[in-house]
């Protein structure tokens, strides 16, 4: 009987040691896991995610003309955001937006808060659906970010070309500027042209961005600047990173591109 008790005790000790070793091994495995994977899991929320550009999406961007042949922004520096957004009637939609990885997490968090608050965004599809045509896309009130292009008459990449600017509810928050002509006259520029009725910002209408509203506040808190604050022109749909930030990336990409070409 004593022998049986000793054997049972021995077996119990071996079992407990084995379990303890297994638990320690499991804890060690978690401790040594990829931090990025842990962060992704802890920050994940159904309907909101950021992804690297897949082969399928990359082909779509090339055929849709947002990633043009002369694009100097590396594919690996871009992220595709999948988010939920609500229209003015409270209907939920799945949106997608390609941005630079530098702003991906911030923009993802902004869209989460806008969705939770029911802030209306009518449409959010990639510019490739419009063959990267800005006017057509803006008339459709589409919200977007990355669309590669250089600033006119320069070799500088625009902020949308870097994926570091975001346009929201474009039809109802148009771009407006007066351009001086050689003869001293001025030409009024409104983009989209169909956005003219919404230049009067004293009026109340759906999808309007106002200084101090939730969309404005969230972007400003993340360090963006709003085109509605500009004095030489107005771009009510537009949020962008400061020039001192974007120029560093633009110069880096230009330098890398020049080295590859030489």
Short names for language-model regions:
Residues 2-12:
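Bacterial N-terminal signal peptides that target proteins for export
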Residues 12-23:
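Bacterial N-terminal signal peptides
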Residues 21-36:
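Sec-dependent signal peptide cleavage junction
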Residues 33-91:
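N-terminal module-boundary/linker segments of secreted carbohydrate-active enzymes
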Residues 73-138:
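Active-site acidic/histidine clusters and adjacent loop/turn architecture
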Residues 84-86, 104, 109-120, 149, ...:
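Structured segments of extracytoplasmic/periplasmic soluble domains
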Residues 121, 136-171:
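Mid-length scaffold segments of soluble, non-membrane domains
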Residues 151-153, 170-262:
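Catalytic cores and adjacent binding grooves of peptidoglycan-active enzymes
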């Amino acid at each position: 009987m004593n022998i049986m008790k000793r054997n049972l005790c021995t077996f119990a000790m071996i079992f407990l040691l084995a379990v303890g070793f297994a638990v320690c091994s499991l804890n060690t495995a978690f401790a040594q896991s990829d931090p990025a994977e842990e962060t992704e899991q802890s920050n994940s929320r159904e309907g909101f995610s950021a992804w690297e550009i897949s082969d399928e999406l990359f082909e779509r961007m090339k055929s849709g003309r947002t990633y043009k042949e002369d694009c100097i922004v590396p594919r690996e520096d871009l992220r595709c955001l999948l988010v939920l957004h609500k229209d003015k009637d409270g209907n939920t939609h799945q949106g997608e937006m390609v941005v630079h990885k530098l702003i991906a997490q911030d923009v993802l968090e902004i869209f989460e808060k806008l969705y939770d608050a029911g802030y209306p965004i009518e449409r959010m599809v990639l510019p490739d659906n419009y063959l990267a045509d800005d006017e057509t896309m803006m008339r459709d009130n589409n919200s977007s970010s990355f669309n590669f292009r250089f600033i006119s008459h320069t070799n500088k990449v625009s902020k949308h070309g870097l994926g570091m600017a975001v346009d929201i509810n474009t039809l109802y928050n148009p771009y407006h500027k007066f351009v001086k002509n050689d003869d001293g006259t001025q030409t009024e520029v409104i983009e989209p042209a169909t956005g003219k009725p919404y230049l009067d910002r004293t009026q109340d209408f759906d999808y309007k961005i106002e200084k101090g509203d939730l969309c404005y506040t969230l972007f400003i808190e993340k360090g963006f600047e709003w085109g509605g604050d500009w004095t030489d022109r107005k771009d009510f749909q537009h949020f962008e990173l400061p020039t001192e930030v974007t120029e560093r990336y633009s110069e880096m990409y230009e330098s890398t591109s020049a080295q590859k070409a030489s």
